[in-house]
Amino acid sequence: GYYWAHPLEIFATNEGGMSFHGGLVGGIIGGVLVCRMYKLDAWTIADLAVIGAPLALCLGRCANFVNGELWGKPTDLPWGVIFGGTAGDMPRHPSQLYEAFLEGIVLFCILQVLSRKKPLLPQGTFMGVFVMGYGIVRFLIEFVRVPDAQLGYLLGGVITMGQLLSLPLVIAGLALIIFAR
């Protein structure tokens, strides 16, 4: 729809809408091109790159929290946060901190434990675990996160764009783990 009619809007990063999903796809494409150019093994580079990626996600989600972005749905839980501004004066789930912990700390710890296994796991395993882990966490967190205003809910209010984009990540990650060489 909209982007077919306005293709240059895809690059309007000042309008928001930047997503980890798109960044991951771009990173993979760029990484594969660089690996081919320098004759490097793409699976090895991908596995090395994703070991520290959860820490970057953790810092990014903490920045989202500090900036009052990507807040959660209203809650009556004692740790609800009042963000003010467009979020209003009601306590909300600190979904950014949930993501920082699960996508960041927990996923980093899982990858660290796996990196110490002997013998070494097959190439592509770490990439698979990272992609699948991110997809699972993001899919679940979307239940307590306010969907992007410009997208809302899809498929008759059943699913968010974040959830829809996370499902292929779970499948791709699982496939990478199963078929790792």
Segments and roles (model prediction):
Residues 1-181:
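A feature for loop-to-transmembrane-helix boundaries and adjacent hydrophobic helices
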